[in-house]
């Protein structure tokens, strides 16, 4: 027998990385919000790698922070190591990565949630949604509690019909042996949602006291203080190193001999795994010409001896895992503390979503995170933030927010999901962004702080600091444009010392900075600023000056794309009435229901001829419409 348990503006199902961002965003925007989770002790849990960031993903964390989300602030408070990656490459691919103290990360984020006004956190298992006339009105828990809401966000991660698999052992479970969510998955199928079966995995954890670190290579963090959040002013200087080792020929022999016992190769696993995070079995089979593979030993926290064996994700049986670990240099006498495993779970086909992450079938119902077919904490958090923002906007009667492909990696991620779909766990890569020179780690605040302020997630004091930063950047760029540097002896000496060509005539400071060997520090030595400028400001001045021509080209491409994005397609257009469309294009357009010509052009199976036919049809103005959209 059910009972009325309360009414809310927004209900978030799940409290992983997507759920935490969704709940916090909705509450901070003024929506009365309820977060329901299977286990309160697992809020913001990291079931796989104890890290945040990396290529593309680190930029997402910066974007989350620029919009007013929490992940960046939280990892800045709880990391054990920070490293800037790809420092020898251009600014488009530089990204920050942090090793997390996974237990502190959980504790701090749960504390933030508990202290946030408008936000209630409750332990309960959601089994059904309350649906009336195609509109989501709330949720029903296993205990019979009926919570009503204006909007609902599902962020169930890998819990939907989750199954853990190790060798021939298979049992129903969420990650880390938590209770799975079975009934909700069945309910989503009853509602007509298409679900797919995906798989991911995790490596074993070992006892640090039993590792011989003398046989490994130390991987320290950066000496220079780093942060994900633009608000962070206190930096953790006491860093803990990671360690690098490798598999051996004995490791590979052992895996080859036991492939028939791997759930991946025995046929026990049916779900599709992540292409960019293969198991060790996959690596040995697919890259059998490689004599060894990298293994990173990553501490799971400051107050634990557990070490994450990055690069050894596996579904081999426990006895094989024990033996395999001891074939790796430095791990000859290691004690395994947790086994690695594969986990299969249900995900929704993401082309069933609008770009707001609202489902097309059920109004006021949003989904975010691994349920949408992605992998990774950062991808989940970015989706959770946008779903939470849009659920709150809907509940408050405000216009929803859609980030474009030229606005943010989050925009690329969501557009890829809802436009192209995915047939494997989706991982964000820099190569997926066509405007990656514009979507850099360093300029996330310049791109998105205005958006965060408009929706109410950026406070006035932070916005004031942001506008002051923008002003200082422009003033310094103008100063360098106005100053001429003459070929004085000290100038020529500096240029020679860095391998540059001597000046023949005077040169603008900005033009000298455009030389590849010249940095802002060199310019500062020659013509110092009278105003003390932060590293963030001088970095922007240097990047914007050096890459001005390339940035301008990218902006021109964006303007051309915007013309297509601004050509809107009615949601209820009847594609069957456009007889000239190719049959595959017609079906894909009906499935995705793009909102613009730009989105239509990115659907696989819709070729340029189909786009032209659709554009002409819409411009003629006589648009046939379907009644059920």
Curated annotation (Swiss-Prot):
GO terms for MF: flavin adenine dinucleotide binding
Chief site of localization: cytoplasm
Record bears the keyword NAD: yes
Positions with a binding annotation for NAD(+): 273-287
GO cellular component, one term: cytosol
SUPFAM superfamilies reported in the protein's UniProt record: FAD/NAD(P)-binding domain
A Pfam family hit: SAM_GIDA_C
Keywords, sorted A to Z: Cytoplasm, FAD, Flavoprotein, NAD, tRNA processing
Coiled coil: none
Compartments in which it is found: Cytoplasm
Residues reported to bind FAD: 14-19, 126, 181, 370
Matches recorded under PROSITE patterns: GIDA_1 (PS01280), GIDA_2 (PS01281)
Cofactor: FAD
Gene Ontology annotations of biological process type: tRNA methylation; tRNA wobble uridine modification
Self-association state and partner proteins as the record states: Homodimer. Heterotetramer of two MnmE and two MnmG subunits.
Family, similarity comment: Belongs to the MnmG family.
Function: NAD-binding protein involved in the addition of a carboxymethylaminomethyl (cmnm) group at the wobble position (U34) of certain tRNAs, forming tRNA-cmnm(5)s(2)U34.
Protein name per the record: tRNA uridine 5-carboxymethylaminomethyl modification enzyme MnmG
Species of provenance: Bacillus mycoides (strain KBAB4)
């Amino acid at each position: 027998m059910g009972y009325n348990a309360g009414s809310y503006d927004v209900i978030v199902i799940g409290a992983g990385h997507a759920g935490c961002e969704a709940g916090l965003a909705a509450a901070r925007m003024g929506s009365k919000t309820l977060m329901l989770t299977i286990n309160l002790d697992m809020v913001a849990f990291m079931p796989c790698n104890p890290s945040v960031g990396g290529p593309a993903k680190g930029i997402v964390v910066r974007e989350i922070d620029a919009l007013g989300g929490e992940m960046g602030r939280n990892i800045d408070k709880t990391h054990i190591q920070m490293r800037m990656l790809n420092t020898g490459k251009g600014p488009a691919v530089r990204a920050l990565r942090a090793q997390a103290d996974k237990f502190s990360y959980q504790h701090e984020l749960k504390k933030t949630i508990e202290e946030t006004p408008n936000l209630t956190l409750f332990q309960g298992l959601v089994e059904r949604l309350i649906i009336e006339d195609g509109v989501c009105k709330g949720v029903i828990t296993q205990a019979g509690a009926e919570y009503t809401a204006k909007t609902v966000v599902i962020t169930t991660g890998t819990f939907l019909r989750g199954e853990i698999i190790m060798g021939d052992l298979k049992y129903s479970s969420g990650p880390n042996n938590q209770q799975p969510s079975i009934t909700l998955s069945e309910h989503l199928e009853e509602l007509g949602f298409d679900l797919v079966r995906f798989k991911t995995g995790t490596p074993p954890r070992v006892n640090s006291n039993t590792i011989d670190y003398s046989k490994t290579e130390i991987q320290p963090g950066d000496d220079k203080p780093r942060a994900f959040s633009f608000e962070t002013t206190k930096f953790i200087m006491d860093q803990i190193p990671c360690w690098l080792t490798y598999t051996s020929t004995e490791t590979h022999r052992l895996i080859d001999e036991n492939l028939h016992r791997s759930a991946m190769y025995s046929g026990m696993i049916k779900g599709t795994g992540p292409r960019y995070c293969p198991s060790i079995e996959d690596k040995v089979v697919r890259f059998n010409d490689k004599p060894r593979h990298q293994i990173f030993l990553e501490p799971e926290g400051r107050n634990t001896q557990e070490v994450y064996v990055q690069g050894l994700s596996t579904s081999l049986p426990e006895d094989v895992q024990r033996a395999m670990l001891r074939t790796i240099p430095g791990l000859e006498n290691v004690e395994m503390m947790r086994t690695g495993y594969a986990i299969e779970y249900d995900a929704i086909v993401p082309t069933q979503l609008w770009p707001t992450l609202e489902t097309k079938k059920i109004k006021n119902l949003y989904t975010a995170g691994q349920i949408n077919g992605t992998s990774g904490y950062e991808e989940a958090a970015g989706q959770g933030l946008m779903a939470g923002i849009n659920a709150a906007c809907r509940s408050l009667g405000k216009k929803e927010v859609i980030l474009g492909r030229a606005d943010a990696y989050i925009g690329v991620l969501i557009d890829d999901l809802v436009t192209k779909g995915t047939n494997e766990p989706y991982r964000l890569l820099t190569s997926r962004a066509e405007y990656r020179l514009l979507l850099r780690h360093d300029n996330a605040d310049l791109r998105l702080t205005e958006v965060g302020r408009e929706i109410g997630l950026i406070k006035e004091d932070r916005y004031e600091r942001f506008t002051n930063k923008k002003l200082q950047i422009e003033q310094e760029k103008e100063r360098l444009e106005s100053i001429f540097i003459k070929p004085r002896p000290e100038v020529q000496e500096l240029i020679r010392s860095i391998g540059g060509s001597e000046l023949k005539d005077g040169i603008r400071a900005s033009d000298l900075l455009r030389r590849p060997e010249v940095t802002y520090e060199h310019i500062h030595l020659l013509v110092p600023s009278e105003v003390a400028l932060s590293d963030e400001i001088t970095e922007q001045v240097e990047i914007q000056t050096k890459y001005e021509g390339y940035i301008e080209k990218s902006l021109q491409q964006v303007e051309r794309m915007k013309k297509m994005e601004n050509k809107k397609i009615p949601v209820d257009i009847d594609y069957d009435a456009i007889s000239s469309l190719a049959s595959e294009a017609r079906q894909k357009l009906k499935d995705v229901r793009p909102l613009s010509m730009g989105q239509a052009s990115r659907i696989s199976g819709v070729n340029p001829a189909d786009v032209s036919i659709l554009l002409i049809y819409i411009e003629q103005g006589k648009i046939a419409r379907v009644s059920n959209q």
